[in-house]
Amino acid sequence: MSQNVYIVSTARTPIGSFQGSLSSKTAVELGAAALKGALAKVPELDASKDFDEIIFGNVLSANLGQAPARQVALTAGLGNHIVATTVNKVCASAMKAIILGAQSIKCGNADVVVAGGCESMTNAPYYMPAARGGAKFGQTVLIDGVERDGLNDAYDGLAMGVHAEKCARDWDITRDQQDSFAIESYQKSQQSQKEGKFDNEIVPVTIKGFRGKPDTQVTNDEEPARLHVEKLKSARTVFQRENGTVTAANASPINDGAAAIILVSERVLKEKNLKPLAIVKGWGEAAHLPADFTWAPSLAVPKALKHAGIEDINSVDYFEFNEAFSVVGLVNTKILKLDPSKVNVYGGAVALGHPLGCSGARVVVTLLSILQQEGGKIGVAAICNGGGGASSVVIEKL
């Protein structure tokens, strides 16, 4: 039983900087905030009974408690009957959640699905492996959970940035090109904030005041304001000291945030008289050598277009690539021979931030905002993930 899959609501939290404005919130709390924001936009759906499933990405799950997706659902007010699945496909987790949700509806297993993701990189713990068996004698080691499970290649133990350097060498992408890309990403995101382009997608997060201080609301992405052009250009390379090109400034930062998307079947769309925002036209995934994860999106995008029945990539109005590093945006634009003016027009993860388990949904939320506000119809989102993979989704604005 194949049927169309519609997006009827999207929402995301602002993206907080590492140990920044959202540091007091767990990933589950951020996920629930995003989901509540999405639910508020579709009052026709009864949160307690109309939802069949939630599929939510989360990468750094240590110390969150069992089944983060289930926690998000119940915290946001969904019924106890809801089936919940947490996805860990590293950076592509939330996009995989969207794909799985669409497949569930297409197969007739569900009619209303929440897809998205959440991450608090700030609150990811350190690990002490020796504590389980007893450290016995002398010093022991603390392992950074963010680095171990989020930012290091599991196969060679190298930082993902080392492979970003490999990509720059392999594809002849210079430090100047990466710095220019990063500056442009910041400038586009700053301009988009100024013009209110993100207002419809962001749901404010309330931060409880302490010691008699009033509660505050976080309403904007925190990172874009941190641009200092001269500091960015003079930043030292991190992963390759001599003749390196990748810096902390032209890579995405470490962040906190969440995003949620509500998917429905055509039957529920008509039955509940819902207004469709977009249709999920297709998706595609690919993988190759783990060290080449940076350009895996260029393999996933053609698969997604084929699945969506789109033969000419030039007919796509806008693209959203997750900017894990500036080189990721540059290399995939280069390989696919895209018009750069169609790519990440509101800025990307270098400037907005990259909360790992959230980003795959965040790029789709922002892509839909772009299509709605810039007059486009067809959009493609893609995101690479550790291990050499990538996921891509094609949407059509309605």
Curated annotation (Swiss-Prot):
GO MF entry, a single one: metal ion binding
Subcellular location, record wording: Cytoplasm
Any GO CC annotation of this UniProt entry: mitochondrion
Keyword Acetylation recorded: yes
Keyword Lipoprotein: no
Modified residues (N-acetylserine): 2
Active site per the UniProt annotation: 91, 354, 384
PROSITE patterns cross-referenced by the UniProt entry: THIOLASE_1, THIOLASE_2, THIOLASE_3
Matching InterPro entries: Thiolase (IPR002155), Thiolase-like (IPR016039), Thiolase_acyl_enz_int_AS (IPR020615), Thiolase_AS (IPR020610), Thiolase_C (IPR020617), Thiolase_CS (IPR020613), Thiolase_N (IPR020616)
Enzyme class: transferase
NCBIfam families (UniProt xref): AcCoA-C-Actrans
General function of this protein: Acetyl-CoA acetyltransferase; part of the first module of ergosterol biosynthesis pathway that includes the early steps of the pathway, conserved across all eukaryotes, and which results in the formation of mevalonate from acetyl-coenzyme A (acetyl-CoA). In this module, the acetyl-CoA acetyltransferase ERG10 catalyzes the formation of acetoacetyl-CoA. The hydroxymethylglutaryl-CoA synthase ERG13 then condenses acetyl-CoA with acetoacetyl-CoA to form HMG-CoA.
Record-given protein name: Acetyl-CoA acetyltransferase
Gene: ERG10
